[in-house]
C-alpha cells in the first residue's frame, strides 16, 4: 500500500502587515497582483505564495525574474498556465495549462487528443509502457490549452508542452 500526503500552506499578507504600506490584502491573506505582478500600490510588486496559486517554489522563482525584468523596463507578463505541476509518484503525473473542467467552465470550445504509452516505442523499450499523454486544443484557433502526462519522467516531458503553450503553437 502507498499513501500520498500533501500538506497545505496559508498566505500571511496580514501577518506581514502589508496594509501598512497601503497594499490590499484579501480576507484569506493573499496580495492580489496583475499579470505584471504589480500590487494596487505603484512600485510595489508581489511574488510567491502570497500572491496565490499555485504555491510552488519554481513559480516564485519565475515571478521574481519577471518582476525584475518589468522593473528594468522590459516587456514581460506572467501567465500561470505556463507553470507545470508534478506529482512525484510512480509513475509520475504532470500537468500544465487548462484542465477540461476549466476549459468547460470558461466556455472554451476545445478538442482533446490522447496517446497511450502502450503504443510508444520509447516507453516499450524502457519497459515502462504504463501511462498516457493528453492534450487540449482550442477548437477554433488550434492552439494548445493544456496538457497532462502520466508515465515515467512525466515531470521532464511536461516542459515541452509548456514551451508549446508559451510559443502559441497551433
Predicted regions and their residues:
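Solvent-exposed alpha-helices and their adjacent loops that cap or buttress functional pockets
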Residues: 38-39, 43, 79-80, 125-128
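Short beta-strand-initiation
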Residues: 3, 82, 130-132
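Short amphipathic alpha-helical segments
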Residues: 43, 83-84, 145
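A conserved FAD-binding loop/helix module that cradles the flavin
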Residues: 47-105
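Flexible, glycine-rich terminal cap/loop adjacent to redox cofactors
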Residues: 72, 88-170
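Short, glycine- and charge-enriched coil/turn segments that flank and shape catalytic ligand pockets
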Residues: 22, 27, 73-77, 106-109
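FAD-site-proximal beta/loop scaffold in flavoenzymes
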Residues: 2-71
Amino acid at each position: 500500500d502507498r499513501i500520498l500526503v500533501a500538506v497545505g500552506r496559508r498566505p500571511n499578507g496580514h501577518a506581514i502587515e502589508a496594509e501598512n504600506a497601503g497594499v490590499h490584502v484579501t480576507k484569506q491573506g493573499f496580495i492580489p497582483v496583475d499579470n505584471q505582478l504589480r500590487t494596487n500600490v505603484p512600485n510595489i510588486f508581489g511574488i510567491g505564495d502570497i500572491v496565490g496559486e499555485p504555491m510552488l517554489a519554481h513559480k516564485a522563482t519565475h515571478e521574481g525574474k519577471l518582476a525584475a525584468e518589468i522593473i528594468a523596463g522590459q516587456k514581460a507578463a506572467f501567465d500561470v498556465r505556463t507553470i507545470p505541476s508534478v506529482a512525484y509518484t510512480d509513475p509520475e503525473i504532470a500537468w500544465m495549462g487548462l484542465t477540461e473542467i476549466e476549459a468547460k467552465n470558461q466556455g472554451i470550445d476545445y478538442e482533446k487528443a490522447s496517446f497511450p504509452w502502450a503504443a510508444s516505442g520509447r516507453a516499450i523499450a524502457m519497459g515502462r509502457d504504463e501511462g498516457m499523454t493528453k492534450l487540449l486544443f482550442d477548437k477554433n484557433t488550434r492552439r494548445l490549452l493544456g496538457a497532462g502526462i502520466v508515465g515515467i519522467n512525466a515531470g521532464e516531458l511536461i516542459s515541452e508542452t509548456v514551451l508549446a503553450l508559451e510559443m502559441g503553437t497551433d
